[in-house]
Amino acid sequence: MAAPDLLTYQDLVDHLLRYSAGGGQDAVTTPIRAAIQTAYRDLLYGRNWNYYYAQYEVPLVAPYSTGTVVYDHAGGTYERMLTLSGGTWPTWAAYGKVIISGIIYDVESRKSNTELTLTENSNPGADVSSIAYSIYRTTYTMPSDYRGSFSPVLESSNSQLKYISPDQWNQLEIRERTASTPTFWTLLGDPNTYASMAIVVHPAVSTAERMRFIYQRAPRQLRYDGYGSERTGTVTISAAATAVTGTTTTFLTEHIGSVIRFGTTSDVPTGISGLNPYKEQQTIGTYTSATSIALSAAVTNAYSAVKYTISDPIDVYPGTINALIRGIEYQFAIMTRQKDVDSAYSLYKEAKIQAYESDNHIAEPRTAASLLRNNPGWTNPLGEDNT
């Protein structure tokens, strides 16, 4: 993706340095980064911005029942081990539930293609000889940047699932075990991934199916600010090329998606409003080594042994930038106990109103029937009720 006009974390740091009349050392010794991070969260998580809506697709998997299983409660290679003969445990088995003799058991871990373990509180309690079984899946991990979503839609039938509470889902899970076409969905904490949510459907699909939904994603995190190791050494790139070669650089895999700016042989590049505006900037597409990366798109000109910076892009809609800048000034005023906190807040509040207005891209009325569910399970109209 080309990056001709992106605002970066570096720009926000530099802005607060100017705002506070600080020097380079102050970038380390003042709460500049804390103010930026706080303002970023406060503004961007305080509203369901249209800019952050994205589509996500979940492949729903059919139950699996090939072969037979033997359950070894204790003393085997693993405690509570379920061994499969005549088949292969699906790669998704860690999220599965196993039915044996009409009873549902929770999977703890997939150990190999033929071995998995059941949880301590959900198992037969004693050894079970070779027997038929079925394993199914109703729990699917949400994207790592998930904040909230609309109800999902099944692709094959274009039917929308109905939201129910986790407690209602639990009752259905116990009472109705036949795989069919999912009708309901809810949200739970992901059982295998910390700080992640999972969508749970009922019933499990009987045949493989795809499900889509629109969700509210989180903005990209801010980690790299163009200072320290993100400006060490020099870089070289040919005209109309994407391959960047560094000298004494420390490129990282985590720099993928960040913005690299090219300066001159004598000057480290700044933002447009700085003393040494960058010559070109592009996002980083791939990482090869500490001295080799490739850009997402080609640069126009050649650069030989020039200074550079790498910084994370500010993942906001352009109409929100002014509010973010006023927000970091306000947070900085709080953290440094400045006397003009109230004035900074007034400017921030006014800028937020303008940002909200810029977020209304569509003139059509919105109704309270348009509901967004986030990870705690609340609902919220996406705009003014159309009464």
Which stretches of residues belong to each language-model region?
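Glycine-enriched, solvent-exposed interface loops adjoining structured elements
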Residues: 1-81, 85-238, 256-387
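Short glycine/serine/proline-enriched coil/turn segments at secondary-structure junctions
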Residues: 251-252
